[in-house]
Amino acid sequence: AAYTENVLDVLQRLKVSVLWRDNNSDSKGVALRVPYEDYRNPDNNPACDIECRDIGMLSGLPDYIDSREGDMLIVLHQMGNHGPAYERRYPATFQGFTPACNSTELAKCSHEEIQNAYDSSILYTDYFLAETIEILKQYQDRYDTTLIYVGDHGESLGENGVYLHGLPFAIAPE
């Protein structure tokens, strides 16, 4: 990524305002040459307790949009539903499925507890996406707004004794 242009570089060269907001594990070099904001700590993210929540990336987003003219691309790199600490991916108010696994040692939890913790993290992601859509709706008269959601990988929740996403696709459970 350091020596090769990617789509963000090309868009920026075409005068598209590009912003990468990160609440995950950095951009892995993808956002090296575009504006980058780190939301993995409470300095930028107002939604931190045991972990900084994805919803914090929406803080100040309308101000950013209001300060720009023309086309823009905003990347919100979520922590999302990454395991094994599913219970850290959502605040307690979003624990919609119980009993839930509250350990990173998934072998100590039942399949139901793991599934419930994961499902609660999905519930929180749904909330995050709904809030993002509400912000975009505010700009429909000024911009053609679009939300594109892309997951970076699937997740195994104990099927055939496999957890997380560490297996090659060829041998991953169906």
Residue ranges and their predicted role:
Residues 1-174:
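Catalytic domains that recognize anionic headgroups
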